[in-house]
Amino acid sequence: METVAVRDIFKNYKEFSNVKLVGWVRSNRDNGSIGFISFTDGSCIHSIQLVYKNGETNNFEEAKSTRTGSAILVEGVVVESKQPNQSFEIKVTNFILLKQADEDYPLQKKEHGAEFLRTIAHLRQRTNKYGTIMRLRSELAFAIHNFFHQNNFVWVSSPIITSNDAEGAGENFYVDSKTVKNFFGKNASLTVSGQMHAEAYAQSYKRVYTFGPTFRAEKSNTNRHVSEFWMVEPEIAFCNLEQLMYLIEEFVKYLIRFILKNCKDEMTFLNKLSNNTLSEKLLNAISHPFEKITYKKAIAILKSDVANKKVKFENESIYFGMDLNSEHEKYLCEKVFNKPLFIYDYPAEIKAFYMKMNADGTTVGACDLLMPGIGEIVGGSERESDYTKLVKKCTKANMKVEDIEWYLALRKYGYHKSAGFGLGFERFLMYVTECENVKDTIPFPRSYGSLDF
C-alpha cells in the first residue's frame, strides 16, 4: 500500500478507507487502553487524529511510549469521528515507530513565544503559525514568478557577488578568499540590489525581473531589519512613472488575490489569530484603487495637521526635503487615507543617484508604496537615461565612475527610457500575515550580532 498525504484525505475523506501514513507526532496522550496522536505529514496545515487501542493496534505499547516530534508510520482505517471539531479520524491497526524524538524536544504541546522560537529556527516551522507563514512564503514565491510569466517578463538571475553598490549607500558586505588575496582583482561585495543588471537586460527584452537574496550591512536590530532578505525587482524599458505605479498596484493586488484564492486554510488560520481583521484588511486593499499623492502634498498635509494639533509626532520638524520617518508614513497611510498609498516625486537629494530628474529640477520621478500596518514595501523610479547627467550625479555622490562604467555606458546604446521597482518580499509577507517582526518571515534570519544556524 502506498502512503497517502494528509492533504488528500482532507479534500474528501469519504473516498478513503484503508490508508498508510508517514509523518510526525504533534502530541500523544493515552488513558491506559486507548491513545490519541495528533499527526502531521507537512502536506497541509491540518493534523489528523490517530486513535490506537489495546488489542486492536499492533505495537500498542510502542505507540503509548512515542514522544512528541517522533517519526512514525501507521496503517489504519478512516472512520467518522464523534468529536464536534473533526469529521473523521484514523483507527490505527498497525503502528511503527521510525525514529523516537529525544525527551528534550523543545516543541511540547504549549504556546511558545516568538522570541523563543527564533532561538530554534531549525524547528519553529513545525508549529502551526510558522508552518503556515513559511508555506505562504513558498506559495507567494510561485505567484511572483507566475505573475511575471503571464505578463511576458524574462527572469534574470542577477549575480550575488558584485563590484558595484546599486544604492550608493555603502552598506556592503565585502567578499574575498582566504587563500588568494584580492581574488577578483578589485573590491567585491554581496549584492544590495539586482537593479543594475536588470536594467542591462531590459534593454534587450524590454520586460525583465530579478528575484533573489540581497544583503545590507545595516547596524540595526529592529523588527523591520535583517541583513539578508529577498527582493523582487522588475525593470521595464520605455516605461514612465505613471505606468510603473499601475504595474506595482496590479502586481500587489495579484499576490493578495492569489493567496486568498489558493491558500484558504492558511489565511483562515491567520485570520483567527488577528481576531478576524486580516481578511477584511486584504479584501479592502484589492477592492479599491490605491491612493496617490506627491511628496509635496504629503509634506503639506503633515505640516497642516501638526499645526492644527490633529496629530503629535516625535519628530514634528516637517519641511520639504526631509526624509519621511515611519511615524509620518504610518499616519498618512493609516489615518489620513486608510488605504495603500503611493507617494511620488521626491526631492532629488534624498533619493538614489540613478533616478531621473523631473522638469522642475528639484524632484525625481520616484515613488514609494505604503501599506497600512507595515509602511513602505515598494520603492521605484524612472531611471536617468542621459549619460552625461548620470556621470555628474555619480561624481556628486562620491562614487567611482570607473566601477560602474558598464552601467553608465548603457545610456550610449539605445537606452531611451526605463523604470523599475523593488518589493521587499519579507516586508510583503509581514503585511499579508500580520507578523510583527521581519525575522519571523524568513527561514533563517541574519541580522546585526546574530548569525545562528
Curated annotation (Swiss-Prot):
EC number: 6.1.1.22
Top class in the EC scheme: ligase
GO biological process: asparaginyl-tRNA aminoacylation
Pfam families: tRNA-synt_2 (PF00152), tRNA_anti-codon (PF01336)
Swiss-Prot/TrEMBL catalytic activity: tRNA(Asn) + L-asparagine + ATP = L-asparaginyl-tRNA(Asn) + AMP + diphosphate + H(+)
GO terms for cellular component: cytoplasm
Cell compartment(s), UniProt: Cytoplasm
Single GO molecular function: nucleic acid binding
Keywords, sorted A to Z: Aminoacyl-tRNA synthetase, ATP-binding, Cytoplasm, Ligase, Nucleotide-binding, Protein biosynthesis
InterPro entries in the cross-refs: Aa-tRNA-synt_II, aa-tRNA-synth_II, aa-tRNA-synth_II/BPL/LPL, Asn-tRNA-ligase, Asp/Asn-tRNA-synth_IIb, NA-bd_OB-fold, NA-bd_OB_tRNA
Primary localization class, coarse: cytoplasm
Record's subunit section: Homodimer.
Family: Belongs to the class-II aminoacyl-tRNA synthetase family.
Full protein name: Asparagine--tRNA ligase
Gene source species: Malacoplasma penetrans (strain HF-2)
Lineage, highest ranks first: Bacteria, Bacillati, Mycoplasmatota, Mycoplasmoidales, Mycoplasmoidaceae
Gene name in the database record: asnS
